[in-house]
Structures are given as C-alpha cells and as structure tokens.
Amino acid sequence: MDAGDDLSQRAQAFARHVVRPGAPRWEAERRIAREAITAAAAIGLTGLEVPVAFGGLGLGYRVKARVAEVLGAADFGFTMSLLNTHNIAAKLAREAPAELARRHVPELLSGRRLGCTALTEAGAGSDFGAIVTMATRTAAGWRLDGAKAWITNAAEAELVVLYAQTEAGRGGCGIACFLVDAARPGFVREPAFALTGQHAIGAGGFRLEGYLARDDEMLHPPGQAFKSALRSINGARVYIASMCNGMVGEALRVASDYGLQRRSFGRPLTEHQGWRWRLAEAATELAAARLLVAQAAARIEAGADAQLYAAQAKLFATRMAERQLPVLAQAMGAEGLREHHPFGRHLAGARVAGFVDGSNEMLLERIAALQRTAPTLENP
C-alpha cells in the first residue's frame, strides 16, 4: 500500500466515524467544526500536498481529489472548510518567504489556525478582475482597504491569503496577493452568513480598514498574483467536482441499501423496474463524472494545462449532482427527509458547488472559448 492509498483509507475511516455522525450536529449548531478539523489534522489531512520538509505528506493532486470525494460524501461544508485550510498551508510552504512559511505552516498543519482565500467581493465574483479592495504603497509596506464577501472559513479563519488591486483600472494586471493576519489591527470580521444546510463551510466576509501588510507579506506582486489565482482555481474546480461525485455516491449507497430493506406491494423496492432504473441512471452519470475528474486531476498533477478539463469536470459533476440528488432523495420517499440521512445537506452542497470557483454559466463561457484549441481525442 502506498502513502496515497493509506491516506485514502484513513480519510474513509475519519468520514465514517467523525464527519457523518457530526455533520447534522454542526449544522444544527450553525458552526465550523473546529474540533473535527483538529482531528483531521492529526491524521495528516491538512498536510496532504504540503512538502515533507515542512511536516506535510508531500502527496500529489490525484490523492487530493480522491480524499475530496471520500470526505465530500460525508459533508460538503466540512470538506470545503478543511481543504481551504490545507490550501493555505500548501501555498505558504511553496510560495511564501521562508521565514513567513516557517512561522505559519505548522499552525495550519496542526489545525490550531484556520486559513481562507479571499478573492470574492460583493460586486466581484466570477469576474475576479473587477475586485476593488485596494492595496496602497506606504513607507512601511502596504495599506489594505476594502471588503471581502462569500469567503469559505471567513467566519473564523485566522490567516487569509487576500487579493487586492494596486492600481485602479488595471484589472487583473494590477492585482497583488498578500498574507493577512486576522488578529492584527485593521481586520474587521463580519457576522457569518446563514447558509441553509452548509454552516460548516463558515462562509462570511470581513473588512480591511487601514490594515498594514509588510513587504514580506506580499506573496505575489502585480502581474503574477492573477495568474497564480487562476491556477489555484483550476485545482479547486476539480476537487469540488470530486466532492459532488462523493455526495452522489453516498446518496446512491443510502438509497440502494434502503431499496433492499423497504418493501412495497409485497416486494423490495429494488424489484420495481421504475425504481431501479432511477438508480441505474444516477450510477451511469456518476461514472462519467468520475472519469472527467480523473482526466483533469492527472493533468493538474502533471503540470499540464488543465483549464478546459477542470471546467468540464466541474460543470458536469455539479449539474449531475443537482440533477441526481433530488432523484435519489425521491427514491427514499419520506424517509429521505430525516436529518440523519445526507440528502438535505447534500442538496444544499450541490447548489453551493454550482457557484463557487466559477458559476456554471462562467464555466460554459470558458469551455466555449477553450474548446477551439483543445486537443483531439486521437491526440490528447
């Protein structure tokens, strides 16, 4: 068994014993599952892609996609929260000045601190180049002013990788990337958003009011930050697609088990043709979505251009989840409404998945633009 298989097995056990039983409680309490993130950190899930030199596991993207499906099957919101902290640890380890990385990566790996990436604003979502949070040069570094919204983990994150405009009107060319410490003056946290079925995601926002960032806290200067963000978004699109596959796979498992036990008109539901055809359709679409994820994940791990493949994987998987989760919930009848089943949370998760890291409409635009130069099937 290699390290990736070992971590996948640990993730499966963690999902079974911690996330599945905990998710209904976290939703009822409307909170991020800090204690579960700490427990996940203890088995290496916050260090999946973090280099071994920093205390991480140094594994590849394909393992990350597998783990995302395993954990997403248990709860979308928790998995988003966990992966966002992991992403900040991995980014700092790879791209931050050495002293900054040495100071902060261990805190993220242990789960003592949460991380988040702050791109989105109230008036700038998929149109990333339209952000208006400003970074103004000062003698001591950079002054940050503005507001971010719809940020995963913003309700509690202590470390923020933030994107800000350095020169109004320059669009993506003027955007820089900074590390922000939420404990310092000038950072004002807004109340967490109330998202039906997805409180574990910790979505919210914050304001920057004269926050001072040092020069060494600029992770990417203008001209590089926008490109770095787009590379990260490709990875996010694929693991979100994988999480959608996990949610549908779990719903299919629950419905299949129920169909063996529940009898209707004197026989199990599985013996009714119409009922089992619904599950067959879901299983077929799930298999196709998994193949798209595998293709995109392989390209990301190889360092190849994955824009088209990531967009296709996310578009298909999110639409598949939005289409099949209601079908599988209907296959359960009223039983599917009970909160210990995942259907309510997964339906909400699928809707969130359709918006984050590029709405489905934006993905269609990207696919339309990219397919003209895409490789042929004979020359992938």
Model-inferred region functions:
Residues 20-28, 263-267, 283-316, 329-337:
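C-terminal helix-coil-helix/basic helical segment that borders enzyme active sites and/or dimer interfaces
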Residues 73, 85, 124, 149-154, ...:
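Glycine-rich phosphate/pyrophosphate-binding beta-alpha loops
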Residues 2, 7, 73, 189-287, ...:
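Glycine-rich beta->alpha junctions and the first turn(s) of the following alpha-helix
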Residues 111-120:
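A short, Trp-centered hydrophobic/proline-enriched beta-strand micro-motif
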